[in-house]
Amino acid sequence: MVRKNTSYLMENSEEALRLELKTDPEAVRGQAVWCGVQPGMHVLDAGCGPGKVTSILWDMLQPRGRILGVDYSEERIQYAKKHYGNRSGIDFRFHDLRHPLDAMGPFDLIWVRFVLEYNRIESFEIIRNLDAVLKPGGSLCLLDLDHNCLSHFPLPAHMERILFELMKLLETRFNFDAYAGRKLYSYLYDLGYDDVALHLLPHHLFYGEVKTEDVFNWVKKVEVVSLKAKELFEDYPGGRGGFFEDFKSFFLSPRRFTYTPLILCKGMKPSLP
């Protein structure tokens, strides 16, 4: 039986900072153009985190565009309101996407980026909830990673084994989905969406020296996640601390090659008959 923990896997005191630093505005804008974000639209940023991406999308929606960011972290909604909520046409609201979005919308476009990977069991339920507040003829845009955090070379075999065991444990204990990206097409297909299209991009592509913000992001991820599965490191030389130091050494080596694919999937909600 799956043991489900409904808390956010990456919750920590620096999560808003991590999410801010890892967001590449140029990459977000390129993805949004592919998704069809245009001025004047009414958009929902589903799972907005600290609001940086919502703010980038707001810029692209002007003039006369509006965007609502929702998230199930009250702390990050307050952060978003403080840092990005002082402009007309942008708003933030606390809401758990696993529940219906009553009295919201309807929206021209719904943006769902890096959300479903943290909600493995409820992913399709979330999609159905979003579909209910999307206008007929509106666009649903799903963006998520696949084979998340698992593609590295030359990672020693004993470290690679720990990483795969860790991801399996996070799946069963914390509802995390390292393979969320490959499932996006099936969601829109099953809902009968029109004009479904997909695109594949490298989200992480690391070789040689790595930018400081990427080092912070990956080291923080390994630090937070490894604390949730200490038993996996009992037989590792030096325990969890030993693994953490070995991974940092590997990741900081300019010989390391690491990549993670990002899958983008968009479709149009069928118009009313």
Give the location of each predicted region.
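Class I SAM-dependent methyltransferase Rossmann-like catalytic core
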Residues: V2-E26
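C-terminal helical/coil "lid" or tail adjacent to the Rossmann-like core of SAM-dependent
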Residues: N5, E14-E15, H199-R256
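A short acidic, Gly/Pro-enriched loop at the edge of an enzyme's catalytic core
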Residues: D102-I110
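A short glycine-rich, Lys/Arg-flanked "PGG" loop and its adjoining helix->strand segment in the class I
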Residues: F124-S139
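Conserved catalytic/acceptor-binding region of the Class I
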Residues: C141-V210
